[in-house]
Design a protein with these regions (language model features):
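Ordered, amphipathic secondary-structure segments that act as subunit-interaction surfaces
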Residues: 32-39
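Conserved small/polar residues in nucleotide/adenosyl-binding loops
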Residues: 230-231
């Protein structure tokens, strides 16, 4: 079990679960990207589930939560809101207190600060039908995923595309930034790609076609968005 998996299972300490639920969660945690892991931890803080069934409901609806990268407190959140969401006039910015803007925004919706970022509910979750929720897919809905490793993290971290948050730089998506943070590196030149999982099974041996992680990730970002447009 990887370090990420152990940290996620620690959140479920004391939860009763069947073997099939445990096995599914183990696979799901192993397949989580860095961003999914962050969303899950934030959602656990927001929802505070008390039963394994509720955790499975939550984990199958992570797309109902949104991450604001780097907005780790009210001040950071206030700057994020003013720079990327509300865009107040320059004449008004001098009179706005970022901490108060951030606090006001935070109090409007279910939310939590998590490891230097802000997680909020973006849409209401839909109760899934009672039954065996472990029959749901054990990995996120990505067009392509790449597993990166570094000297500091040889276990590797999955990063998935497309990443479609409305408030991020599409050329530097939160998925990638969070993966670099988890790998304790600043650039892709410090990483190696160790695995690829593509939504199109006819595309094979992708890893062997690239000499660098940077080139592979650049094409994965483009591929992920292309796949997302075909699903519109």
């Amino acid at each position: 079990m990887s370090t990420q998996d152990r940290k996620l299972f620690d959140l479920l300490d004391g939860f009763e679960m069947t073997k099939s639920e445990y096995d599914w969660l183990e696979r799901r945690f192993e397949n989580m990207t860095a961003k999914e892991s962050m969303l899950f931890r934030g959602a656990m803080q927001i929802e505070r589930p008390e039963k394994t069934f509720d955790v499975l409901q939550l984990i199958n609806q992570l797309d109902h939560y949104e991450l604001f990268y780097g907005a780790g407190d009210d001040i950071g959140l206030g700057h994020f809101v003013m720079n990327r969401i509300k865009h107040p006039a320059s004449s008004a910015r001098a009179y706005l207190d970022p901490a108060k803007v951030g606090a006001a925004f935070r109090q409007q919706v279910g939310s939590a600060f998590c490891d230097g970022h802000f997680i909020k509910i973006s849409s209401l979750t839909v109760p899934l039908l009672d039954g065996d929720l472990t029959q749901y897919p054990d990995k996120g809905d990505y067009g392509i995923r790449v597993k990166l490793a570094s000297r500091s993290n040889m276990e590797g971290i999955w990063v998935g595309f497309p990443d479609t948050s409305a408030y991020m730089d599409s050329s530097h998506p939160d998925e990638l930034l969070l993966a670099l943070d988890a790998l304790e590196v600043e650039t892709l030149t410090e990483c190696i790609a160790v695995d690829v999982d593509c939504g199109l099974p006819q595309l094979r041996d992708i890893l062997s076609q690239y000499d660098s992680a940077a080139e592979l990730i650049r094409h994965a970002i483009d591929f992920g968005y292309a796949v997302s447009y075909t699903h519109l």
